């Protein structure tokens, strides 16, 4: 599934029944034993055959595109990375058949560093496949190539032929372990860099793809869902593929990454069906990406996207960050006022007092500063102070100009994330009429419960005391 609505869609289905440059690669690659992977399923959607796989350090989404413009794409939640092959236009439509489902593998690059990926076999009824472009990088660049046909020069990768194989591989631009995709022809032949069909008009390939980005830690189904969750296998599988201890993803293949609004809405909708560990993973991901002002990050840029973004724009906000640290976008304002209601619902309605206190005391490691951490309670309190500060002008002077506007210089700032979404307006109704009142009410509830007392000075408590 390819849109950011995937997780919210899964929430509805679950709750309905619940009652709510690599110079070369080493030849040796380790294929996981024949035991079934922890998660493996397929979804055919329109012209796309999608095969999802997760097993230990491997998480990958293989997409085979049918039609006159075939392509192969593998997306990895690790680093929101991916590899893709786009082929020249065909005279007629051609269809892929996945003849062997993806198997997880761990391999080594030429410097002995691990890459995590998959191997699968497929056939396609086409007389010839000529590779138009290979893109190996962060998925944002794969999306760019898909939509506008351009990528940065820094990530261009040459094609290499070796017998019956076509190989594309490279290190990341900072020299870290990178990406690879290899096509071995199993039926037909290679000719001048193109794959020519056999006498029966079919092409057969073995595909290997891998990424060197740091693996994420998947949440098992037992850690993710409780007994109230619907017995909907498709929804469970999709949710599991998108759920990790480090964060929840918005959707695959295009959005295997964090979005603040998507995370908070999904956690709240799914809360009746989620295990505490899953709720805490979602809220924790938001806290880990909060800025010093208490604002919630809308989106993150990862791995090679972050590296190239910094090379182009520099660390305008902080030049002490690592070159490959995530870049965080704080342009949206609606998610700032979603955190308090979601956190209050969990801490006051679903978790026991002991669970709530334990969660708030847990250290949350910063997503951008390796080794930096603060208690979850301190981070949540920071957001509540931001909410109250932003709401104070309207409390003191109840007129239109005291409402909370979208940020200066922007045409977007909430879920209607398009330049015409607010009709060129500055004051979003949902933010001011629904989200801010909900955030203030949640602040008052949390303050009254005393859960945040260890994380507030007397002055800060006084700041928040008039919230509700």
For the regions a language model picked out, list residue spans one by one.
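An acidic intrinsically disordered interaction segment
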Residues: 218-239, 295-304, 392-409
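Acidic/His metal-coordination segments adjacent to aromatic residues that form catalytic metal sites
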Residues: 240-249, 305-330, 408-428
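Secondary-shell segments that build the walls of catalytic and ion/ligand-binding clefts
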Residues: 376-422
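Aromatic-rich carbohydrate-recognition surfaces in CAZymes
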Residues: 256-396, 433
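Catalytic cores of carbohydrate-active enzymes
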Residues: 297-299, 388, 398-401, 418-419, ...
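C-terminal/domain-terminus segments
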Residues: 226-230, 235, 355-365, 454-463
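Terminal accessory carbohydrate-recognition/targeting modules of carbohydrate-active enzymes
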Residues: 2-22, 28-235, 243-247, 251-257, ...
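Eukaryote-specific, cytoplasm-facing alpha-helical/coiled-coil scaffolding segments in long proteins
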Residues: 293, 362-373, 411-416, 460-467
